[in-house]
A protein has these predicted regions:
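Active-site catalytic-loop/activation-segment of kinase and kinase-like phosphoryl-transfer enzymes
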Residues: 1-47, 151
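Charge-dense, low-complexity intrinsically disordered segments
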Residues: 9, 24-35, 108-112, 137, ...
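Active-site acidic catalytic loop and adjacent metal/ATP-binding pocket
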Residues: 42-90
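Active-site activation/catalytic loop segments of kinase-like enzymes and analogous catalytic loops
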Residues: 89-129, 143-161
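All-alpha amphipathic helical-bundle segments outside canonical DNA-binding/catalytic cores
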Residues: 130-142
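Regulatory N- and C-terminal appendages and interdomain linkers associated
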Residues: 152-189
Length: 189
């Protein structure tokens, strides 16, 4: 678990590695903003370090493009990444971030059907797992996923305004003790 948390923050495929690929001074960020985010992520690493009881089997890259549906509810999950053991919040945020991402691109906020499915996704997970700690450990995983979808390399056609909203989300989630999935729009401001 300690290694998974460290890797989420500092691995070349995760937060620090994604930031390595950002331009030196992108228009949508203040000078030094990535450095301040990285410092906050290191604090999260140490906050979560002792939660080894949360170690569980994970997919590691559980997003919509890795779920292939056939008939009805029959599906296959593709492309397991970064090992089979980790933190459930990683898989949850990999999927959930997409609902935020697509809604923010179109509306500048989480709304409509995407808000409904986002909230149902969270409620279903919490109802089935009784994971009372999830909302207090989820921040660095949402930060990682927000850094990916705001990336100029991975998503070159996004507007600066959309990237800024995603970074507002990233900041506000990292600054919160607990994530309120019913109030996502407050994190986007």
């Amino acid at each position: 678990y300690q290694r998974k948390i460290r890797d989420t923050v500092g691995h070349g495929e995760c937060i620090f590695g994604i930031f390595d690929d950002y331009p030196e001074n992108p228009d949508f960020l203040e000078r030094g903003e990535l450095c301040r985010i990285e410092k906050l992520c290191v604090e999260w690493r140490w906050r979560l370090r002792g939660k080894a009881h949360r170690l569980c089997q994970v997919h590691g890259d559980f997003h919509p493009w890795n779920v292939m549906f056939r008939e009805g509810t029959d599906f296959t999950v593709l492309d397991r990444s970064r090992g089979e053991w980790g933190e459930a919040a990683d898989d949850l945020t990999a999927m959930a971030m997409n609902y935020i991402f697509y809604s923010v691109q179109k509306h500048g906020r989480l709304t409509g059907d995407l808000q409904e499915i986002f909230e149902l996704f969270f409620e279903n997970y919490l109802d089935k797992t009784h994971d009372d700690e999830l909302q207090s450990v989820i921040a660095p995983f949402f930060a990682f996923r927000a850094a990916v979808v705001a990336s100029p390399t991975w998503y070159p056609l996004l507007s600066g305004q959309t990237r800024r909203i995603l970074f507002n989300f990233l900041w506000n989630v990292l600054r919160s003790e607990s994530f309120d999935y019913l109030d996502v729009n407050s994190y986007l401001k």
